[in-house]
Amino acid sequence: MIKVGCCGFPVSQSKYYDLFGLVELNTTFYKYPSQRTAEGWRKRAPEKFEFTVKAHQDISHKYRLKIEQARDSFERVKQICRILRAKIILIQTPASFTAKYINDAEEFFMNIERDDFILVWETRGPTWENEKGLKMLRDALSRVNVTHVTDPLRLMPAHIADIAYFRLHGLGVHLYYYQYTNDELERLYEIARKHEALKMGAYILFNNLAMFDDARRFKFYIENGYFPPLTGNYGLEAIKTLISQTRYPATKKSLIDKIGWRIVELEPGRQVRLSDLLSPMPEKTYKSSEEILDDLENYISL
């Protein structure tokens, strides 16, 4: 079983529910919702719709997984999950919670009262991603039966327990500013399908700026075996659609920074990142999207 959704609602809830059966609630990381608010979320969602919950930052950032200090906060998160009928709780620690704190993490996961909830942990920072850090994670998480959460296109998890839980933040220089290509989504599917026989299967949660479109395309691919068009437009028309969404005047550098991460389909099955098309163009300030299109025709062979 492979389940696909987004981290938060990138579109209206009604539009989201029409397409997906899963969402990771992120607002719970910043604020404890009232019982009434949580009940409203559950009531508005379809009966079989599934929520996963990102645990409040009190647990991971303020109390840094110190179990006695974090226990009350964790109980509040569990209460939210009960209202939502959520089974999975995501703990995300900051980059300052380095690998030297592995014992605190293991003690937390070993002794916190989980009840029937499944805990997954997303680490941040380079100390968890080298050989030593990954081994420490693998050893500790196997003892406490907790899945390590990563973007598997960047880094494979150190340990996967009863569930594979992947969060896709993007592969670009700047976190979140990214759109996945068809080839990358195919690779993601090949990874996910290796874990779909797990007790809870594989959960794929997109958390990049193009999360809704990427999740939609990925779900379509799983169900149909091929990808839908990005926009229905190709070549210069597809480029025009993207570059018309920014303000002018704009320098080439600002265009690359703001929208260069987007994908353009030059023709069916042929994708290129917009930054690759803009890079050969002259360094200047563009007054309009039409001026960019004129230069593209002169400098780029489409």
Spell out what each predicted region is.
Residues 1-234, 245-246, 269, 287:
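Residues lining hydrophobic/aromatic ligand-binding pockets adjacent to catalytic sites
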Residues 230-302:
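Basic helix-extension-helix modules of the SAP/HeH family
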